[in-house]
Protein backbone atom coordinates (compact mmCIF):
# COMPACT_ATOMS: atom_id res chain seq x y z
CA UNK A 1 0.00 0.00 0.00
CA UNK A 2 1.51 3.34 -1.07
CA UNK A 3 0.41 6.91 -0.45
CA UNK A 4 1.12 9.92 -2.61
CA UNK A 5 1.94 12.84 -0.38
CA UNK A 6 2.26 16.50 -1.22
CA UNK A 7 3.61 18.73 1.54
CA UNK A 8 2.96 22.43 1.10
CA UNK A 9 3.89 25.33 3.30
CA UNK A 10 2.76 28.95 3.16
CA UNK A 11 3.90 31.97 5.03
CA UNK A 12 1.51 33.84 7.30
CA UNK A 13 1.46 36.73 4.81
CA UNK A 14 0.39 34.47 1.96
CA UNK A 15 -2.35 32.85 4.02
CA UNK A 16 -3.76 36.26 5.03
CA UNK A 17 -3.19 38.42 1.96
CA UNK A 18 -3.84 36.04 -0.90
CA UNK A 19 -6.02 36.41 -3.95
CA UNK A 20 -8.73 33.86 -4.78
CA UNK A 21 -7.25 33.44 -8.28
CA UNK A 22 -3.86 32.55 -6.78
CA UNK A 23 -5.47 30.02 -4.45
CA UNK A 24 -7.46 28.31 -7.21
CA UNK A 25 -4.44 28.20 -9.55
CA UNK A 26 -2.28 26.83 -6.74
CA UNK A 27 -4.78 24.04 -6.06
CA UNK A 28 -5.01 23.24 -9.79
CA UNK A 29 -1.20 23.05 -10.09
CA UNK A 30 -0.90 20.74 -7.08
CA UNK A 31 -3.70 18.50 -8.40
CA UNK A 32 -2.06 18.27 -11.83
CA UNK A 33 1.31 17.39 -10.31
CA UNK A 34 -0.27 14.66 -8.19
CA UNK A 35 -2.12 13.18 -11.18
CA UNK A 36 1.12 13.09 -13.19
CA UNK A 37 2.91 11.35 -10.31
CA UNK A 38 0.10 8.77 -10.10
CA UNK A 39 0.18 8.17 -13.86
CA UNK A 40 3.96 7.74 -13.79
CA UNK A 41 3.71 5.23 -10.94
CA UNK A 42 0.90 3.27 -12.63
CA UNK A 43 2.85 2.91 -15.87
CA UNK A 44 6.48 2.66 -14.79
CA UNK A 45 6.66 2.70 -10.98
CA UNK A 46 9.61 0.75 -9.59
CA UNK A 47 7.68 -0.98 -6.81
CA UNK A 48 10.12 0.36 -4.23
CA UNK A 49 8.41 3.10 -2.22
CA UNK A 50 5.80 3.39 -4.97
CA UNK A 51 3.42 1.05 -6.77
CA UNK A 52 4.89 -1.45 -9.20
CA UNK A 53 4.09 -0.12 -12.66
CA UNK A 54 2.59 -1.97 -15.60
CA UNK A 55 5.91 -1.98 -17.46
CA UNK A 56 7.75 -3.42 -14.44
CA UNK A 57 5.49 -6.46 -14.04
CA UNK A 58 6.76 -9.88 -15.06
CA UNK A 59 5.11 -10.71 -18.37
CA UNK A 60 3.34 -14.04 -18.67
CA UNK A 61 5.13 -16.36 -21.10
CA UNK A 62 3.83 -15.85 -24.63
CA UNK A 63 2.45 -12.36 -23.98
CA UNK A 64 5.62 -10.42 -24.76
CA UNK A 65 6.31 -9.59 -28.40
CA UNK A 66 9.98 -8.99 -29.18
CA UNK A 67 10.99 -6.72 -32.03
CA UNK A 68 14.43 -7.31 -33.57
CA UNK A 69 16.95 -4.62 -32.59
CA UNK A 70 17.80 -3.78 -36.20
CA UNK A 71 14.15 -3.18 -37.11
CA UNK A 72 13.66 0.27 -38.61
CA UNK A 73 9.86 0.23 -38.54
CA UNK A 74 7.06 -1.70 -36.90
CA UNK A 75 5.37 -4.24 -39.12
CA UNK A 76 1.70 -5.13 -39.41
CA UNK A 77 2.55 -8.66 -38.25
CA UNK A 78 4.11 -7.27 -35.03
CA UNK A 79 0.83 -5.58 -34.15
CA UNK A 80 -1.19 -8.67 -35.04
CA UNK A 81 1.06 -10.79 -32.79
CA UNK A 82 0.50 -8.35 -29.91
CA UNK A 83 -3.28 -8.50 -30.37
CA UNK A 84 -3.17 -12.29 -30.57
CA UNK A 85 -1.11 -12.51 -27.36
CA UNK A 86 -3.78 -10.66 -25.34
CA UNK A 87 -5.87 -13.21 -23.42
CA UNK A 88 -9.50 -13.14 -24.50
CA UNK A 89 -10.64 -12.49 -20.91
CA UNK A 90 -9.02 -9.02 -21.11
CA UNK A 91 -10.10 -8.24 -24.65
CA UNK A 92 -13.29 -6.23 -24.07
CA UNK A 93 -11.86 -3.26 -22.15
CA UNK A 94 -8.17 -3.35 -23.06
CA UNK A 95 -6.54 -0.36 -24.76
CA UNK A 96 -3.28 0.19 -26.60
CA UNK A 97 -0.84 2.50 -24.79
CA UNK A 98 2.02 4.21 -26.62
CA UNK A 99 3.56 7.58 -27.31
CA UNK A 100 2.00 9.94 -29.82
CA UNK A 101 5.21 9.75 -31.85
CA UNK A 102 5.04 5.94 -32.07
CA UNK A 103 1.38 6.08 -33.09
CA UNK A 104 1.78 8.72 -35.79
CA UNK A 105 5.21 7.79 -37.16
CA UNK A 106 4.91 3.99 -37.04
CA UNK A 107 1.23 3.08 -37.16
CA UNK A 108 -0.86 5.78 -38.84
CA UNK A 109 -0.67 4.98 -42.54
CA UNK A 110 0.02 1.27 -41.97
CA UNK A 111 -2.34 -0.99 -43.92
CA UNK A 112 -3.29 -4.64 -43.72
CA UNK A 113 -2.93 -7.12 -46.58
CA UNK A 114 -6.26 -5.86 -48.01
CA UNK A 115 -4.83 -2.31 -48.05
CA UNK A 116 -7.19 -1.18 -45.29
CA UNK A 117 -5.75 1.14 -42.62
CA UNK A 118 -5.20 -0.53 -39.25
CA UNK A 119 -5.29 2.76 -37.34
CA UNK A 120 -7.84 5.53 -37.36
CA UNK A 121 -7.96 9.09 -36.12
CA UNK A 122 -11.54 10.27 -35.77
CA UNK A 123 -12.99 13.38 -34.25
CA UNK A 124 -15.41 12.67 -31.43
CA UNK A 125 -18.49 14.59 -30.41
CA UNK A 126 -16.38 17.10 -28.51
CA UNK A 127 -14.19 17.72 -31.56
CA UNK A 128 -11.18 16.11 -29.89
CA UNK A 129 -9.33 13.36 -31.75
CA UNK A 130 -10.10 9.74 -30.91
CA UNK A 131 -7.32 7.29 -31.78
CA UNK A 132 -7.84 3.60 -32.50
CA UNK A 133 -5.83 0.60 -33.65
CA UNK A 134 -7.67 -2.51 -34.88
CA UNK A 135 -10.80 -0.87 -33.45
CA UNK A 136 -9.25 -0.70 -29.98
CA UNK A 137 -8.76 2.68 -28.28
CA UNK A 138 -5.22 4.06 -28.21
CA UNK A 139 -4.20 5.98 -25.08
CA UNK A 140 -1.26 8.30 -25.69
CA UNK A 141 1.16 8.03 -22.77
CA UNK A 142 4.20 9.70 -24.30
CA UNK A 143 5.41 11.25 -21.08
CA UNK A 144 5.81 7.80 -19.54
CA UNK A 145 6.98 5.54 -22.39
CA UNK A 146 9.79 5.93 -24.91
CA UNK A 147 8.89 6.12 -28.59
CA UNK A 148 9.81 3.36 -31.03
CA UNK A 149 13.08 4.12 -32.79
CA UNK A 150 15.17 2.22 -35.32
CA UNK A 151 17.84 1.81 -32.65
CA UNK A 152 15.54 0.45 -29.95
CA UNK A 153 17.53 -1.47 -27.34
CA UNK A 154 16.70 -4.80 -25.73
CA UNK A 155 13.87 -4.82 -23.19
CA UNK A 156 12.60 -1.37 -24.21
CA UNK A 157 8.83 -1.20 -23.83
CA UNK A 158 7.39 1.31 -26.30
CA UNK A 159 3.78 0.07 -26.37
CA UNK A 160 1.49 -2.28 -24.49
CA UNK A 161 -2.11 -3.45 -24.39
CA UNK A 162 -3.73 -3.20 -20.98
CA UNK A 163 -7.12 -3.28 -19.28
CA UNK A 164 -7.02 -0.37 -16.82
CA UNK A 165 -9.90 -1.88 -14.86
CA UNK A 166 -7.38 -4.40 -13.48
Place the predicted regions along the sequence by residue.
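Structured, hydrophobic secondary-structure cores that serve as assembly/anchoring elements
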Residues: 1-166
Amino acid sequence: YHKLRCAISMSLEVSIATYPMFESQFVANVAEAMVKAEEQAIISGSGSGQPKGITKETVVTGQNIDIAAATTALAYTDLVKAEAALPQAYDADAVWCMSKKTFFEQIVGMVDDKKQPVARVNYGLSGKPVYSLFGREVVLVGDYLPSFTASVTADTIFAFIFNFKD
